[in-house]
Design a protein with these regions (language model features):
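A short, internal acetyl-CoA/4′-phosphopantetheine-binding micro-motif in the GNAT/acyltransferase core
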Residues: 73-84
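A conserved beta-strand-loop-helix scaffold within acyl/acetyltransferase catalytic domains
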Residues: 17-43, 49, 57-67
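A structural microfeature
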Residues: 53-55, 131
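Conserved acyl-CoA
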Residues: 87-103
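Short amphipathic alpha-helix that is part of the acyltransferase structural core
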Residues: 1-26
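Conserved beta-strand-loop-alpha-helix junction that forms the acyl-donor binding cleft
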Residues: 105-118, 137-138
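A conserved beta-turn-beta hairpin within the catalytic core of GNAT-like acetyltransferases
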Residues: 63-74, 130
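C-terminal "cap" of GNAT-fold acetyltransferases
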Residues: 118-119, 123-138
Length: 138
């Protein structure tokens, strides 16, 4: 897990969300319960040749009352290696299909230098642009 912290630091400092930073300790504590990990939070990571993890992708089972559907919703996707990151996504999608999710939601952060490239990647995979979020400090 500590290897992944390096990815959080890079994302938070240079490419992260506007005004907000990933809180790695809170994320770990929030999803440490075994019941949540079995039913509602799904995580895959890539172990690089050097013995360190260089990528992570996680999804939540969004039991969305607004749409009346369970949606396989991206929680976080961080990767130093785009090839490994793509394999993580492929593994996650295969899992979602096996579990009979009907929908998947992926996101991209506007501040990320590859945001446009990621959006084109999603569109090539058949994803449709759906909504845009705005954030402000109160």
């Amino acid at each position: 897990v500590s290897d992944i912290f390096e990815l959080f630091d890079l994302e938070n400092e240079k490419m992260g969300h506007a005004l907000l930073k990933h809180n790695k300790e809170y994320i770990i504590n929030a999803f440490a319960d075994k019941a949540i990990l079995v039913w509602d939070f799904f995580v895959w990571a890539n172990l690089a040749e050097n013995g360190k993890y260089d990528g992570i992708i996680a999804f939540v089972n969004d039991k969305n009352e607004k749409f009346g559907e369970q949606i396989f919703s991206e929680y976080i996707w961080l990767s130093k290696n785009s090839r490994a990151g793509g394999k993580l996504l492929g593994t996650a999608i295969k899992f979602a299909r096996k579990k009979e999710f009907k929908y998947i939601i992926m996101n991209t952060v506007v501040n990320h230098p590859k945001s446009d490239k990621i959006a084109r990647f999603y569109e090539k995979m058949g994803f449709l642009r759906d909504s845009i979020s705005y954030v402000a400090k109160l």
